[in-house]
Amino acid sequence: MAGSTKDIDALIELMARLPGLGPRSARRAVLHLIRKRALLLTPLADLMGQVAATARECLNCGNVGTSDICDICTDERRATGELCVVEDVADLWAMERSGVFKGRYHVLGGTLSALDGVGPDELRIPRLADRVTAEAISEVILALNATIDGQTTAHYIADQLGGRVRLTSLAQGVPIGGELDYLDDGTISAAMRARKEL
């Protein structure tokens, strides 16, 4: 081989640690970046340096941005009485893409998990209780994943906040375009329990 590829190999190895990329996909991505150095690699490296220097968690809700308090928390047009609780930032961003929620968010940073040793103090649950009181929240919407840990977390939060605020959760069941034959028993069961009048 004409020259050392140590740095390129290290980049491939690092890229392979990203979600959704294995060693083969990482190698293809790195080779593509190198081929498109001026168009992709150089601007990407510059932006990654900027993000590494400025990215931080919002001190209020846990969103990711470039200031101590994120744009959502400082947006005065947002409904201040509604707080949507999500597991992580990716869930917050998914809710924002839908455009249906106009309130504020609270990112837990995960779910309770006895197997993984994650308790309430490892998450932002105590901060959630503080926000409900300090911000005069009237409704907490639990938008947690329909997993065992997600449901355990939802029940724990309901126990902690019960009686202090209206608690709701996202409906669960048959997705738009979904066919019953392809759904698991738990999804069909949840859909039956959440049925509504037409």
Curated annotation (Swiss-Prot):
Record flagged with keyword Zinc: yes
Residues in Toprim domain copies: 81-175
Annotated disulfide bonds: none
GO BP, sorted A to Z: DNA recombination; DNA repair
GO MF terms, alphabetically ordered: DNA binding; zinc ion binding
Top-level lineage group: Bacteria
PROSITE patterns, alphabetized: TOPRIM (PS50880)
Matching CDD domains: TOPRIM_recR
Record's keyword terms, sorted: DNA damage, DNA recombination, DNA repair, Metal-binding, Zinc, Zinc-finger
InterPro entries: DNA_Rcmb_RecR, Rcmb_RecR, Rcmb_RecR_Znf, TOPRIM_dom, TOPRIM_RecR
Positions annotated as zinc finger (C4-type): 58-73
Similarity annotation: Belongs to the RecR family.
Function per UniProt: May play a role in DNA repair. It seems to be involved in an RecBC-independent recombinational process of DNA repair. It may act with RecF and RecO.
Descriptive protein name: Recombination protein RecR
Native organism: Ruegeria pomeroyi (strain ATCC 700808 / DSM 15171 / DSS-3) (Silicibacter pomeroyi)
Phylogenetic placement of the source organism: Bacteria, Pseudomonadati, Pseudomonadota, Alphaproteobacteria, Rhodobacterales
